[in-house]
């Protein structure tokens, strides 16, 4: 079912509540990476260009104490947003109460207000985690501040919080619209097409430490993918399931039987490393060597080897749809980053394919290589994109009104 989007709404003179994802890294008041702020700009600009009053809500980090509040204020984000929009942005150091209501009452068409971190509602109250546990009264209060609601936070779409599901539910109950922003719409389009209607050959690339994080994705994508390429720590659980020696490599002993059943179910669709970069310890400075698919007892696999890279490249060169989630090795250490970087290069070389990257390390690799402009879509949601690839319904999308 197609969702209502921000451009379907009449925004002139309307108070537009927007749930954005401004959960950016901040240290000592300095923003380390403003990508998520930049990603929200198309929706914010559309609203203010069409005479709407943009009232922005976001969480930032996990708030467990008053000390966290000092570190996790959205004030630096509001200041950065003002620079990016090249216009004043009002920051309100509260997200409930008289100061909030007065700031909104004083807004003119085209103004932007940022309310304080929604997770400040997770402490110092009788309910408990009002935001994270979706206190309906909080959702109703926030909904009362606006005329329409736009959810543009894909990063929290797999969570049912007061600031997404709570507001949308209260809005719809009051006969007001709840729409998707441009970022949410883009995520639905790219991930939805990949999961539901991919152009073949469709190749899924999965990495990262744990099989347990990706079980649902593998099960959902086995029937849809032509190939599933597996690297990273999770590959060693699969190699162990095939009877290979994995030395001291990271693996999940309790998932070996499951890996066996996934291999049986997938037939030859699952492609595992045929060689590895192995070291005596988990350190960039440790002696390391290239070994086959059996790893010596005193070593651990920390990256895919050059033959595996070639094998993966050979499969990828014909792909028309590629979804990549998770690194091929211990990417944070230069000696074990090459497999991940080579996969990134292979994706960038594809000319007529839809390429989608999700997950922090895969995204970091794309940035390090400078290939982001050559990738069709880089997802802004880690857990949310995994849940989507599993075929799960995401509360933050389900709560948006259908067209």
Curated annotation (Swiss-Prot):
Binding, ATP: 214, 301, 332, 359-362
Cellular compartments annotated: Cytoplasm
Keyword Amino-acid biosynthesis: no
Pathway: Carbohydrate degradation; glycolysis; pyruvate from D-glyceraldehyde 3-phosphate: step 2/5
Main location: cytoplasm
SUPFAM superfamilies for this protein: Phosphoglycerate kinase (SSF53748)
GO biological process per UniProt: gluconeogenesis; glycolytic process
Family recorded in the similarity comment: Belongs to the phosphoglycerate kinase family.
Name of the protein in its database record: Phosphoglycerate kinase
Organism field: Lactobacillus johnsonii (strain CNCM I-12250 / La1 / NCC 533)
Upper taxonomic lineage: Bacteria, Bacillati, Bacillota, Bacilli, Lactobacillales
Gene field: pgk
